[in-house]
């Protein structure tokens, strides 16, 4: 009997070149409630949504919100759960031009970033349960902000800095200038503000001249 040819190794997901080019998503349950986590594979910036009803409708709503904030991703990696394979999700991804990469037993590593994000999300949730056993939402979101500002142990750069070019304000006192944008951006913003101010002055002068002419009639 002839030996069967060995199967080809699974094609690995491509390496991202910029924030939110490639994202990964997964669902998990914590204390009887469903959550969806979506993570950017470039910066490891996580988004964590509570899903009251679950299902594709809520997932699509989460993606729509993310795409309008961070831009439309080229590809999303998920497992084969029905919420990801459902017709509503597939139609949304197709309409927005997003490729869907499904993980499998042979290619489980393609969604490992989402699985890591789930562990981190559960840790954040666990650490912010109040004395009554309920999630302290303010404390949780502050912890999420802090996590996004925490430098990666390997790259030494935080998710926030990779996405925005600076840390985001999380309520922790910082030295002056910590949240300032890049100098080149500041110069462009200053030029824009000067141009706006100039237009306002010209507009005011024209309006004043027009009013004066009316009074002269």
Where are these regions (language model features)?
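Secondary-structure transition/capping motifs at alpha-helix termini
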Residues: 67-73, 95-99
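Mobile-element integrase/transposase regions
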Residues: 1-35
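Active-site beta-loop-alpha junctions of metal-dependent nucleic acid enzymes
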Residues: 48-70, 82
